[in-house]
């Protein structure tokens, strides 16, 4: 639903803003929530209508955000700053919509693509720092806002169900891709099993570690704040590290048709790992360090099988621009995993070198 400007001014009046509102305009290119920039004769703000189709439990979502941001602020970290409603709540239900306001973080930039290893190293530092400052936080306090989000065995069961149904008869056109995921079935439970038996610690995980969720200082280029905290959940930090490697250490876009352009860059892997481990070295466990290289494989396989399951089901989840779009995405993910497997000894050596240097 598109709100009128008059409606938006009325919605903004429910929040304890400093200064008179002078303008409200659409902001950013996010696809989940609807976001506006609020200008006043004082500070600027971000006004958001939350997507309750994807996140139906607004109460616990905002509770998660409040718990994590208050913990970070107590340690002097810059983070999202929730602006309360005029009645002191963290969000408001207005005309059937769920709304919230954050203070706008000024003098920052963000990137959609990795421009160079230095920026990716800084991204690693930002998410390592995020993990480090929350290392003593009891992640079991958090609610799972999207069930089974990085539960790879559960995703594999979803994939097998889509394959068994094959409701559009597409399986015959992608048998090599199907065989790839079936042949790796013994790898999918490694992290979930570790979380269950305690060999991998339960931590706060961000679960959407795209580069554009880091605000960097416009002058120094240093990371200032991690944003988009809606998918904050309990899990393994290997989820965040692995997904960062999946998208950031690739030389091509996720839907590149020409697989000769798709490569796994160990240079970018090293850069991110240097930043991440450099911040987290005080709390990373030996088992987590051992699994850092594999986490890239795991999260890339998980994402690829989700693309393939969606292709088999008729493209009902991921937005597509042409009939084979999800299959193309699947193939890029498989190519990345194949190169990760080929370079496994190199990435293990990189992690060992960085861990040794960080001692």
UniProtKB/Swiss-Prot annotation:
One of its GO terms (molecular function) is phosphotransferase activity, alcohol group as acceptor. One of its GO terms (biological process) is carbohydrate metabolic process. Optimum pH is 8.5. Stable at pH 5.0 to 9.5 at 30 degrees Celsius. It comes from the Bacteria. It holds the Pfam family APH. Residues 21-359 form the Protein kinase domain. It catalyses: N-acetyl-D-hexosamine + ATP = N-acetyl-alpha-D-hexosamine 1-phosphate + ADP + H(+). Keywords: ATP-binding, Carbohydrate metabolism, Kinase, Magnesium, Nucleotide-binding, Transferase. It is an enzyme of class 2 (transferase). Its EC number is 2.7.1.162. The keyword Kinase applies. The keyword Endoplasmic reticulum does not apply. Phosphorylates both N-acetylglucosamine (GlcNAc) and N-acetylgalactosamine (GalNAc) at similar rates. Involved in the lacto-N-biose I/galacto-N-biose (LNB/GNB) degradation pathway, which is important for host intestinal colonization by bifidobacteria. Also accepts GTP and ITP as phosphate donors. In vitro, can phosphorylate several GlcNAc and GalNAc derivatives. This is N-acetylhexosamine 1-kinase. The gene is nahK.
């Amino acid at each position: 639903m598109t709100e009128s400007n008059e409606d938006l001014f009325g919605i903004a009046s429910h929040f304890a803003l400093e200064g008179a509102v002078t303008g409200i305009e659409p902001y950013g290119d996010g696809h989940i929530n609807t976001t506006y920039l609020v200008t006043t004769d004082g500070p600027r703000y971000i006004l958001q209508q939350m997507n309750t189709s994807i996140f139906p439990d607004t109460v616990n979502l905002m509770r998660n955000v409040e718990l994590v941001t208050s913990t970070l602020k107590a340690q002097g970290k810059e983070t999202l700053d929730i602006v309360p409603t005029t009645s002191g709540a963290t969000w408001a239900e207005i005309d059937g919509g769920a709304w919230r306001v954050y203070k706008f973080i000024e003098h920052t930039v963000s990137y959609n693509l990795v421009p160079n290893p230095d920026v990716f190293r800084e991204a690693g530092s930002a998410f390592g720092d995020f993990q480090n400052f929350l290392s003593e936080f009891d992640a079991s306090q958090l609610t799972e806002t999207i069930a089974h989000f990085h539960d790879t065995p559960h995703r594999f069961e979803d994939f097998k169900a889509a394959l068994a149904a094959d409701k559009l008869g597409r399986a015959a056109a992608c048998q090599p891709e199907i065989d790839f995921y079936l042949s790796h079935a013994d790898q999918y439970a490694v992290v979930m099993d570790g979380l269950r038996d305690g060999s991998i610690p339960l931590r706060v995980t961000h679960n959407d570690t795209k580069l554009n969720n880091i605000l960097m200082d416009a002058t120094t280029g240093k990371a200032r704040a991690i944003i988009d905290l809606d998918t904050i959940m309990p899990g393994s930090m290997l989820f965040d590290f692995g997904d960062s490697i999946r998208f950031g250490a690739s030389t091509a876009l996720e839907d590149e048709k020409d697989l000769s352009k798709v490569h796994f860059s160990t240079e970018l892997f090293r850069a991110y790992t240097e930043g991440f481990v450099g911040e987290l070295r005080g709390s990373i466990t030996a088992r987590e360090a051992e699994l850092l290289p594999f986490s890239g494989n795991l999260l890339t396989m998980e994402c690829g099988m989700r693309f393939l399951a969606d292709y088999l089901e008729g493209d009902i989840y991921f937005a597509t621009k042409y009939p084979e779009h999800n299959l193309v995405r699947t193939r890029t993910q498989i190519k990345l995993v194949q190169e990760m497997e080929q370079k496994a000894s190199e990435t293990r050596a990189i992690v060992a070198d960085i861990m040794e240097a960080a001692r």
